[in-house]
């Protein structure tokens, strides 16, 4: 029995609350009907209203009245959310018509997402009544069952089976999913229906759409992604409402037989209304132009269907339209200004790519533009050039003066530790900032060389390129079994506008891209032939098992220097059957001449060729079929000499579907000429909109009714010819645009009409094309305008061509920069592409989901390697004379390569031009040293050099001279690199020279100075002596070296001497780097001329050290001692920030006040655990930096008061060495606390605060500081009590190179105010071999350059007595040193390659013999024999000449001997700094045993003497420990 068919339908009109009340009443009524014998309990219904789920509803196009309207619904069809929606059974759709569409659209804030508030009802009473009815019916039947006995019921049902109850009363209720939203009463309802969601056919991609390689198959049809048909509707605006459960979305559907095509520019909007099906003009449409907030202007289209509205265009605007039939359309327009006329500054550098430490030359040229063609000189004014590195950090600022005629120029030097990446130049000029860029690449010195020797000097097209690669270590030994990877890219020489250019780089497939070098280090090279003139770029990446690969790029030119021809015709298109004359001419004299022509029809690939007459200049071709043709000229070898494209019109011509082809008859027009444009449509077209555009729509016309600015001729059904007279206002270019619509689609095409702009013709000519290194190159520059000479300002650079292979030119062509082809400022759009959408959300509020983002990693390229000289010449300002001539010369650098000369120029009228030329530096025989220049006394190096030969088996003579001895060697060289061992016995300092002779003529010569230093660790020493006229005894140690004299007569000279010594301190930790920055800043302030060469050097050193500090910074701008991992130290952080502040103040680099707050943030976190001296120093720096620190000072004063005085303070006697560091060695000693007390008193006095420390404690601290031998204590006392230059000089005289750099730097900085500016005291030249040098901070000194050690100093008798400081370097074994309980052990292991790449087995080295071809592991073990932690130390490890530490250990794993098949241990990151013949490892804390491991290579053969490795306390240098025994004090490298 079907109980549900009797249900009432009135529940559709009841709210959810009301239905609940009725259910409660009915339940109560059933309880009271006397059903006492029945089971009154009501079973659960297991019913829940369908929740639904989110989905998207969108209308992705508009529709005409003859089309079926539809909307798209996208629901999740592949996850759990589908099951939440399936039980609803589909999607409820309602379609409404909007009575007043224009008012409705104007009220919307976002036309893409229409907002109409819903009327939410909920689930309703229907399903409640269903359950109640079924439940009551079941219970009533049970009551009736109990009324009769079981036997009676059985008898009745047997007689009348239709009375059997069966499963009717236990069958679950059937529920109906009701629409939970009421219809919108405001809008007429057109129709409503429920559409099957999961059963409907999903949207499929268009036929043939397939993405090759897509693993997710994301374009396959997905359930739930469907179109919902709405039927054909009358023109108007319709609202669609879609509902699933409690989720609802709305969108609008535009129905119109009219399309609005719009063109928006800066202050104007052009609208053309056309028929959607046929594309005819449709007048009488009402148009509103709105920015989404309000209507900016409005109008009605005229008889041609066009309307022009004037208003400033916002970035985004909308067109709301309603045609005469009631159809509604919307168009969205985007506009951005792409052409602005103002000051243009052309900023470029001498080359696009640099290495760290290189000099960068910058040139600035500028004009003030008023329109595309007319400009005036810029205003002469000062400007500031800022340099930002790849991290965005400001490196330096350079003052540049811009001149109206000559522009400006400047230069700067990159820091030696500059990071790799893109750098930005920002020029601040007259309240505007202009930008340019260049790149920096880091280069690691390769541990072997890769040479390329080709079998032929010249290769032609069609010939395979063959040769060999040669891999050699610096000592000439071949790199055996090296893994070599080859990568080849080709750049074809192509004709573009009769200009020979290299096209894009395309990879070339190689059969053997990976190979292995043979026993002689050779790799056979066989590259495929090039079918066209090309430039091959061969990248070679080789590895001998080291942690990094040696990578180099070689250039191979195919048919280099080949002359080319120009090929031209009167028009770029013609009619089919018409005879076309093509003319050709050689651009340069050459033996190659064209003998045949060939054309290729692109549509069907048919071709034809013909012979050219001997000595002819033209040929004629008759094209029978319309289409697009490519014509080429070839020589007798089939080589392409010229090429041209040509279009042919005729019946049957048509463009590709959806496109319009426009071909101009010429690429360049002169004013007064007529531009002919061939227009080809994809189908017969009768109407289109033609416009001329640039900054606005300059002209407009219909295809059916041509305007007076053009003439039109219809050639056939699909082709028209437009003729446009060219006026002066068209220059430099204007856009000719064609726009049409048909069958609900629209298409437009732009074609440029380029008009000639006068440009300088700059020619570069050298007296020859090939030079030898060292030769004088004479360059002639010519500037002309329209064939007549003209004077111009030129900038010329000569750069290694391989730079452009690594990094193409960044600066644009100067002509394209100042007179670029104007960008079209008109944006075209249509109402066909407007999309409205909505996302269905639940009517109940839900918490927002979490955002999921993924990080994109950045991949870095392998580092390349270059030659030493990259810019051979840079002429920033040359002026050609009235004849347009200018000349300059330069010496060809000592490198073999191809050079590019680039000349850029501008004349007084602002016309510009650019020219380019090439030349080569070549030499048949070329030598290069392959040995270090610094050795130790006792070393016996095996000297050698490389000879690069372009010849094969030619006899030569090598003549070498050293220490008065001459040696001659007769050699026979093979082609490529030849390593030659020299016969000289070199064991002392001197000049080594070599000459290479052939047939009695010197082919090449080189020389280098060799130095032999002491074979012990050096120690810097100094003393002050009084010198007078006559002879003065020096009394220096016999082994003294680097002897120098400098005056210390005045406090100013003492100050300069200390400043210079501090700047020369080695190593790069936070302490030393900051300690160099402060004296450098003092030196900068003392300079009178900040543009001098000395100022440039100091500025460069400041930049280097500032960048080093930046690189040492850790997270949160906190610093550790040497940039190691760990939490930042507040004291070191403050020292780094203070040093950076000093440098910034000196150079004028401004920062916001909160920038320096990092310093106090770190202090606030750690102050309670810091020594009092460190706290006082940090606050002294903060006070000097004008940071807020009064509260912190009070806290420090209270801490000192709490300490008071202790018994040990009085009992402890200050016996410390004067060279020991109070700040870093014993910062918690009683003396350090006393110094902190005195310094705090000074700070409180400056801050006008009172101390809480007891007077007797202050007096004790004062006495202890005064009686100390520490320079820091004396400096603090002087700051508190005041003093003069004499007292300051006394403190400065006690500073030595053995003392801590931070204490010396602080003393100099705090005592600098006592140093009045005085001229340097001139120390006369002593008799003998003394050379004069400049001090960093000003002044001069004399250095001994003679042999041995001078005994006496002789001056003229007129010299009055003068204080002089003598500085020298002596061996550590002769200086006073104190040992500390630390054991230093050194062990070398040879790395034996394992089965896997980058895995090695360690083989202990038991003798002093070293293989120069092998890789070694240097293991240093330190063992402290005391319980106390030794802080701030360093291990100094000697190296023989030519040895080097590998920069990285990444990926290398090593196994100890007898480790079996255990997994290798990865090497830790190398942490070292290189010194002279040694490397240093910082050791922040030493307790127990610590081991350091580094990879070493030994390149120089010979017998070498080494001092033992040692451990030194960094800030107590007299405390050290050396390795015991004689092991590793000598090495023999073979």
UniProtKB/Swiss-Prot annotation:
Q: Does the keyword Transit peptide apply?
A: no
Give the molecular function GO annotations.
Answer: endopeptidase inhibitor activity
- Pfam families in the cross-refs: A2M, A2M_BRD, MG2
Q: Which UniProt keywords apply?
A: Signal
Which SUPFAM superfamilies would you find in this protein's record? Terpenoid cyclases/Protein prenyltransferases (SSF48239)
Q: Which Gene3D superfamilies match?
A: 2.60.40.1930, Immunoglobulins (2.60.40.10)
Q: Does the keyword Cell wall biogenesis/degradation apply?
A: no
Signal peptide start and end residues: 1-38
Instruction: Give the family per the record.
Output: Belongs to the protease inhibitor I39 (alpha-2-macroglobulin) family. Bacterial alpha-2-macroglobulin subfamily.
**Under which name does UniProt file this protein?**
Alpha-2-macroglobulin homolog
Question: What species was this sequence derived from?
Answer: Escherichia coli O157:H7
């Amino acid at each position: 029995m079907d109980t549900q068919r009797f249900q009432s339908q009135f529940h559709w009109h009841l709210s959810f609350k009301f239905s609940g009340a009725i259910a409660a009443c009915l339940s109560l009524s059933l309880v009271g009907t006397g059903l006492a014998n029945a089971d009154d309990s009501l079973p659960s219904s297991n019913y829940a209203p369908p929740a639904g789920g989110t989905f998207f509803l969108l209308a992705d196009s508009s529709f005409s009245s003859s089309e079926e309207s539809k909307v798209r619904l996208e629901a999740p069809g592949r996850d759990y959310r589908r099951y939440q929606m399936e039980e609803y059974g589909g999607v409820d759709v309602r379609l409404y018509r909007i009575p007043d569409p224009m008012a409705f659209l104007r009220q919307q804030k976002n036309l893409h997402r229409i907002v109409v508030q819903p009327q939410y009802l909920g689930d309703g009473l229907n399903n409640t009544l269903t359950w109640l009815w079924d439940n009551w019916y079941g219970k009533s039947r049970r009551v009736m069952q109990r009324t009769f006995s079981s036997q009676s019921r059985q008898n009745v049902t047997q007689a009348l089976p239709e009375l059997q109850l069966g499963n009717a009363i236990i069958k679950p209720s059937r529920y109906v999913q009701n629409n939970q939203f009421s219809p919108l009463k405001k809008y007429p309802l057109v129709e409503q229906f429920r559409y099957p969601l999961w059963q409907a056919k999903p949207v499929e991609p268009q036929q043939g759409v397939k993405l090759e390689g897509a693993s997710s198959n994301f374009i396959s049809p997905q359930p739930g992604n469907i179109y919902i048909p709405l039927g054909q509707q009358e023109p108007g605006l319709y609202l669609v409402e879609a509902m699933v459960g409690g989720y609802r979305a709305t969108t609008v559907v535009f129905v119109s037989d009219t399309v609005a095509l719009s063109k928006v520019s800066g202050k104007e909007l052009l609208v053309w209304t056309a028929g959607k099906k046929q594309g005819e003009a449709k007048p009488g449409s009402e148009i509103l132009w709105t920015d989404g907030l309000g209507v900016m202007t409005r109008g009605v289209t005229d008889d041609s269907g066009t309307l022009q509205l004037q208003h400033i265009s916002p970035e985004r605007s909308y067109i709301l339209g309603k045609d005469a039939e009631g159809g509604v359309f919307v168009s969205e327009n985007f506009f951005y200004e792409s052409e602005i006329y103002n000051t243009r500054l052309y900023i470029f550098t001498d080359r696009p790519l640099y290495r760290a430490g290189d000099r960068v030359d910058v040139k600035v040229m500028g004009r003030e533009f008023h329109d595309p063609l007319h400009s005036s000189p810029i205003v002469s004014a000062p400007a500031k050039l800022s340099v930002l590195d790849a991290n965005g950090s400001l490196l330096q600022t350079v003052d540049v003066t811009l001149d109206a005629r000559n522009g400006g120029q400047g230069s700067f030097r990159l820091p030696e530790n500059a990071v790799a990446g893109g750098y930005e130049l920002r020029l601040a000029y007259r309240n505007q900032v202009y930008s340019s860029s260049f790149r920096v690449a880091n280069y690691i010195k390769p541990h072997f060389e890769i040479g390329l020797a080709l079998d032929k000097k010249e290769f032609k097209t069609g010939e395979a390129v063959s040769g060999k690669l040669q891999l050699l270590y610096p000592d000439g030994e071949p790199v055996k079994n090296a893994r070599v990877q080859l990568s080849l890219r080709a750049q074809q020489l192509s004709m573009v506008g009769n200009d020979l250019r290299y096209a894009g780089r395309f990879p070339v497939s190689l059969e053997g891209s990976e190979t292995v070098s043979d026993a002689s280090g050779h790799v056979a090279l066989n590259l495929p032939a090039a079918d066209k003139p090309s430039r091959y770029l061969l990248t070679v990446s080789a590895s001998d098992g080291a942690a990094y690969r040696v990578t180099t790029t070689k250039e191979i030119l195919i048919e280099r220097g080949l002359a080319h021809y120009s090929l031209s015709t009167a028009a770029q298109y013609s009619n089919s059957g018409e005879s076309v004359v093509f003319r050709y001419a050689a651009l340069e004299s050459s033996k190659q001449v064209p003998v045949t022509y060939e054309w290729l029809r692109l549509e069907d690939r048919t071709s034809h060729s013909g012979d050219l007459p001997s000595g002819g200049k033209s040929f004629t071709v008759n094209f029978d079929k319309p289409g697009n043709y490519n014509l080429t000229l070839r020589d007798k070898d089939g080589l392409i000499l010229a090429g041209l494209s040509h279009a042919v019109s005729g019946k049957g011509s048509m463009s590709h579907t959806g496109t319009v082809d426009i071909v101009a008859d010429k690429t360049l027009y002169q004013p007064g000429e007529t531009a002919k444009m061939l227009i080809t449509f994809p189908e017969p077209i009768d109407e289109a909109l033609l416009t001329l555009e640039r900054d606005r729509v300059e002209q407009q016309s219909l295809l059916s009714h041509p305007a007076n600015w053009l003439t039109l001729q219809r050639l056939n059904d699909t082709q028209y010819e437009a003729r446009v007279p060219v006026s002066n206002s068209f220059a430099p270019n204007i856009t000719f645009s064609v726009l049409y619509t048909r069958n609900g689609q629209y298409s437009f095409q732009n074609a440029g009409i380029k008009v000639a702009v006068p440009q300088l013709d700059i020619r570069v000519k050298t007296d020859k094309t090939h030079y030898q290194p060292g030769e004088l190159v004479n360059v002639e520059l010519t500037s002309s305008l329209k064939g007549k000479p003209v004077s111009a300002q030129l900038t010329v650079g000569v750069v290694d061509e391989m730079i452009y292979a690594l990094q193409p030119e960044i600066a644009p062509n100067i002509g394209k920069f100042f007179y670029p082809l104007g960008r079209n400022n008109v944006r075209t759009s249509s109402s066909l592409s407007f999309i409205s959408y909505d996302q269905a959300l639940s009517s109940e509020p839900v918490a927002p989901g979490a955002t999921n983002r993924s990080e994109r990693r950045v991949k870095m390229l392998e580092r390349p390697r270059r030659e030493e000289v990259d810019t051979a010449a840079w002429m920033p300002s040359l002026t050609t004379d009235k004849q347009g001539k200018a000349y300059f010369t330069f010496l060809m650098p000592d490198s073999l390569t191809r050079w590019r000369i680039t000349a850029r120029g501008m004349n007084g009228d602002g016309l510009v031009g650019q020219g380019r030329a090439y030349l080569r530096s070549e030499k048949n025989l070329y030598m290069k040293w392959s040995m270090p220049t610094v050795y130790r006394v006792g070393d016996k190096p095996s000297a050698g050099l490389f000879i690069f030969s372009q010849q094969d088996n030619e006899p030569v003579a090598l003549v070498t001279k050293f220490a008065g001895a001459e040696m001659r060697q007769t050699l026979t060289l093979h082609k490529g690199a030849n390593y030659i061992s020299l016969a000289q016995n070199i064991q002392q300092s001197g000049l080594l020279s070599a000459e290479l002779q052939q047939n009695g003529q010197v082919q090449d010569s080189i020389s280098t100075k060799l130095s032999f230093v002491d074979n012990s660790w050096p120690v810097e020493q100094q003393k002050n002596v009084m010198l007078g006229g006559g002879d003065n005894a020096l009394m220096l140690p016999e082994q003294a070296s680097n002897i120098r004299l400098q005056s210390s007569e005045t406090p100013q000279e003492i100050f300069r001497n200390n400043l210079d010594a501090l700047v020369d301190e080695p190593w790069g930790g936070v302490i030393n780097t900051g300690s160099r920055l402060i004296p450098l800043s003092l030196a900068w302030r003392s300079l009178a001329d900040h543009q001098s060469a000395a100022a440039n050097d100091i500025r460069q050193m400041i930049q280097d050290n500032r960048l080093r500090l930046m690189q040492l910074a850790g997270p949160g701008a906190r610093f550790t001692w040497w940039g190691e991992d760990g939490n930042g130290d507040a004291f070191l952080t403050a020292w780094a920030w203070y040093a950076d502040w000093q440098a910034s103040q000196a150079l004028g680099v401004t920062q916001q006040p909160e920038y320096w707050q990092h310093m106090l943030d770190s202090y606030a976190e750690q102050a309670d655990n810091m020594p009092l001296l460190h706290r006082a120093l940090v606050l002294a720096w903060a006070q000097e930096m004008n940071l807020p620190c009064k509260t912190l000072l009070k806290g420090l004063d209270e801490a000192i008061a709490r300490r008071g005085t202790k018994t040990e303070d009085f009992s402890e006697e200050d016996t410390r060495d004067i060279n020991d560091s109070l700040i870093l060695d014993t910062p918690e000693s009683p003396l350090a606390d006393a110094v902190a007390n005195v310094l705090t008193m000074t700070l409180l006095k400056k801050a006008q605060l009172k101390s809480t420390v007891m007077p007797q404690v202050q007096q004790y601290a004062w006495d202890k500081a005064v009686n100390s031998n520490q320079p820091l204590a004396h400096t603090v006392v002087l700051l508190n009590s005041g003093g003069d230059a004499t007292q300051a000089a006394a403190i400065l005289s006690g500073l030595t190179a053995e003392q801590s750099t931070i204490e010396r730097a602080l003393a100099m900085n705090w005592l600098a105010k006592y140093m009045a500016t005085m001229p340097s005291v001139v120390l006369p030249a002593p008799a003998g071999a003394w050379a004069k040098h400049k001090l960093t901070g000003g002044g001069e000194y004399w250095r001994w350059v003679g042999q041995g050690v001078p005994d006496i100093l002789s001056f003229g008798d007129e010299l009055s007595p003068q204080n002089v400081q003598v500085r020298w370097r002596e061996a550590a074994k002769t200086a006073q040193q104190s040992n500390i309980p630390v054991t230093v052990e050194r062990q070398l292991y040879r790395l034996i390659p394992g089965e896997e790449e980058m895995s090695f087995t360690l083989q202990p080295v038991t003798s002093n013999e070293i293989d120069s071809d092998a890789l070694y592991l240097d293991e240093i073990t330190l063992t402290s024999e005391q319980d106390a932690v030794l802080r701030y130390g360093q291990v100094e490890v000697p190296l023989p000449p030519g040895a080097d530490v590998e920069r990285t250990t990444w990926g290398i794993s090593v196994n100890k001997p007898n480790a079996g098949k255990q997994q290798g241990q990865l090497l830790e990151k190398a942490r070292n700094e290189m010194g002279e013949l040694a490397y240093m490892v910082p050791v922040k804390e030493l307790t127990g045993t610590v081991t350091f491991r580094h990879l070493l290579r030994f390149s120089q053969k010979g017998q070498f003497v080494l001092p033992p490795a040692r451990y030194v306390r960094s800030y107590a240098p007299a405390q050290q420990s050396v390795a015991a025994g004689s092991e590793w004090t000598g090495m023999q490298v073979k």
